[in-house]
Amino acid sequence: MSQTSLKQKKNEPGMRSSKESLEAEKRKESDKTGVRLSNQMRRAVNPNHSLRCCPFQGHSSCRRCLCAAEGTALGPCHTIRIYIHMCLLWEQGQQITMMRGSQESSLRKTDSRGYLVRSQWSRISRSPSTKAPSIDEPRSRNTSAKLPSSSTSSRTPSTSPSLHDSSPPPLSGQPSLQPPASPQLPRSLDSRPPTPPEPDPGSRRSTKMQENPEAWAQGIVREIRQTRDSQPLEYSRTSPTEWKSSSQRRGIYPASTQLDRNSLSEQQQQQREDEDDYEAAYWASMRSFYEKNPSCSRPWPPKPKNAITIALSSCALFNMVDGRKIYEQEGLEKYMEYQLTNENVILTPGPAFRFVKALQYVNARLRDLYPDEQDLFDIVLMTNNHAQVGVRLINSVNHYGLLIDRFCLTGGKDPIGYLKAYLTNLYIAADSEKVQEAIQEGIASATMFDGAKDMAYCDTQLRVAFDGDAVLFSDESEHFTKEHGLDKFFQYDTLCESKPLAQGPLKGFLEDLGRLQKKFYAKNERLLCPIRTYLVTARSAASSGARVLKTLRRWGLEIDEALFLAGAPKSPILVKIRPHIFFDDHMFHIEGAQRLGSIAAYGFNKKFSS
């Protein structure tokens, strides 16, 4: 009901109403008008509604424009026609309707690979555009809008819209004579649209996505489809990132990736620190256990990561020839039966037995000088025997008082695969095939041969003898001698006197021995040091001795005795030295030492010459 009819009713005779009834009736009319206008606005925002298209003075239907509802909110014969390019923002809790008439630029920038740059993916240009919207433009991606309403017709507050250079047409005072256009069906989406890039955090599109996620996604897909169809992509001919080297790819990763890696390394470092603390607590408890039990005469074992681990085969530590014969002649079951029957029979010492006794004496001396010392020899018994055979081995170890706490019984499986897990520094076995397998794994290994049983060895001093070439040093001198002769080799070595020799497989073990020797030297125990090293080489001191000694000096290593034989036999020297083990690469010298009763080891040259 209009205001004119209200005045007529007020002037008619017989219509006497109080001021309160008139005010109540006005409020009812205002409420009805507000409800009607809100319903019309809701229909106008609907994308399928007929008011979605806007006929205005010859202006054809534009999918980027939205015609507001026609109503009587502002009085009769007043029509609201507002053509807007909607971009909703949410700022400080208020909805702002941005009226824009901008249009995308037809020319899109691409990078070196032909992809659109990030700013080109945005449908709204950062700089306002005054170009009029085209008829062929796709329909607006936004399907929800808030129109500004009068304070008298709407109880919800709204702010005035912000305009760009192209302002909307003025309000018309005449109602529209054209019928509303029929609703247009939305275009079908592409079957496999490409994934749009990640939007900027401060962009307006994120606000649209929060307002209406479904409509925002449809608008993005239409935009990508239009961009892809309008201009083909041109790809650069540079090779992919995966083809580049790792050094070239480092610059491609963003800083966030580097931060993630740094944080990951910090986590790993923290985890290692926790593991170290747990391990330290465990070994502290082990030490307290040994100290609180006077009946336990065995000292606490060293930490594996700090110790010098020597892995021994059971055949190198004990004499197991009889059991080996039974296994080869009668099979595994008879061998197992034989070992179980004789598990209380103590095994006789093998070729590495005296070597182990000398290692234990060095550990005892180090514990006397350094009670908390962890840099000790740790012996591991490694065998492919069955676990039941281990009972006889344990009984024999305890009978001789050997401090061997770690066993590896693989039950017929090759134990070479466990060497690295045990942090092995040196592997000694009686089987040359096992030694070659360990060498292929990169572990210093040697085959130990037994000497004369009646020869006396010193148990209070560890004596280790090394050959020079292919043992402490590389085998390049042997190859040079074979190719050019001995005279040329002497001349070459004299010219290269100041050039250090390349390291050999046993250089690391000599470093370990030297590190332990320095612990005794620090306590003024040089003359009473329980470790003594020997260099027994066929080189000539006059021609190549200086280069050998300078190489050891360059490495920071000391050798107690250097014996240059100039091609003479080594066996008489080894008999005089009586080393617990002699590392040599030539089988001829080992056989000679074996005949004279010296314990020798072989098996190094294959690693460096192959």
From Swiss-Prot:
Catalyzed reaction equations: a ribonucleoside 5'-phosphate + H2O = a ribonucleoside + phosphate; AMP + H2O = adenosine + phosphate
Keywords carried by this UniProt record: Cytoplasm, Hydrolase, Magnesium, Nucleotide metabolism
Ranges of compositional bias, category Basic and acidic residues: 9-34
GO CC terms: cytosol; nucleus
Biased composition (Low complexity): 148-166
Residue ranges, annotated region (Disordered): 1-34, 101-277
Regulation of its activity: Activated by ADP.
Regions of compositional bias (Pro residues) in chain numbering: 167-183
Cofactor: Mg(2+)
Any Gene Ontology biological process: purine nucleotide catabolic process
Polar residues bias locations: 119-132, 236-265
One MF term in the entry's GO annotations: 5'-nucleotidase activity
EC number: 3.1.3.5
Primary location class: cytoplasm
UniProt function note: Catalyzes the hydrolysis of nucleotide monophosphates, releasing inorganic phosphate and the corresponding nucleoside, AMP is the major substrate.
Protein name: Cytosolic 5'-nucleotidase 1B
UniProt source species: Homo sapiens (Human)
Lineage of the organism: Eukaryota, Metazoa, Chordata, Craniata, Vertebrata
